[in-house]
Amino acid sequence: MNDTSGRADALAAQYRTDGYCVDRQALTSAEVTALVDEATRLCREEAARLVGGDVAGDNADDLGRFLAIHFPHKLSPLMLATLAHPRIVDVLTRAIGPNVKSMQSMLFIKNAGKPGQAWHQDEDFIPTRDRSLGAAWIALDDATVDNGCLWVIPGSHRPGVLWPLRQHENPEYDFAPESFDFPYSDADAIPVEVPAGSIVFFHGHLLHKSLRNRRTTGFRRALVNHYMSAESLLPWWRDGGAIAPTHDLRDIVMVAGTDPYAYKGIVDLNRPYVRAESARTTPA
C-alpha cells in the first residue's frame, strides 16, 4: 500500500466513524492561489449575470457584499475541474463508493463581520435514497474560530435521523433554518480549524454549523462541493420553484466510476446565483 492509498483509507475510515475527516493542505499553494484568483474574478465579472446578483465593483471590499455564489462550477472551468480533484476522488470513492456524482458547488466568501449558519444537516436539503450525500469543503483561507470555521458534532450522522428544522432569530447566524430537538448539546461540538488548501469531508447527516467571522478585516473563503453515490436517484428540488420536484434530477457531473443511469442523459437546469444575507437558501 502506498502513502496516498493509506492516507485515503484512513480518512475514509474516520469519515465513516465520526462523520467527517480532514485532509490537511491537500491542495498545493499554487492550486489555492488559482482558486482564490478565480473566486475574485467570479465576484467581479460574473455577478451581474447571476440570477438575483448585484454588480460587483473593482475594489476588494466589494467582494464582501456576497455571502456565496451557488453553482460556480457552471461559470468556471477551473471550479468544474476541481469537482474531480484527485485528493477528493481518492477519499470519496472509499467513503461513498466507486461511482460518484456531484450535483452542487458553492463558493462562500464570508467577509469580516458576516454571519455563520446554524446547526443543520445537508441531507435535509439535498436528499439521496441511500444516505450517501457528502461534502468536500475546501478552505481557500486559513479557517479559524475567529473567522468562522466549521463546527461539527462527531458521530451525529450515525443515527441516520434528519432532525426537525425551524426558523430562528439568532443574529450570529444567517437566515437559513436550524436543526433542533437532537440529542446533543454545544458541549459535544468541536471546531474544525484548518489551513488554506485543506479539505474537510463530512457526511450529509452530520450536524454542523459555522459562527460569525469576528475579525475586522479579511475573508474566510471556501469552495464547497456536494457528492453522492451514482447509484442513488436524486429527488431534489430547490426553494421558490427554481427547480420543480423531480424523481431523479440529472443535472449532475460524474467525478468517478460509471453512471448507471447514463441512458437518461444529462440536463442543465440549475442556474448560478448569488446568495444574499436576506434571501432564502439551499444549504451548505
Regions found by a protein language model. Give the residues of each.
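Non-heme Fe(II)-dependent double-stranded beta-helix
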Residues: 1-18, 24-119, 125-128, 165, ...
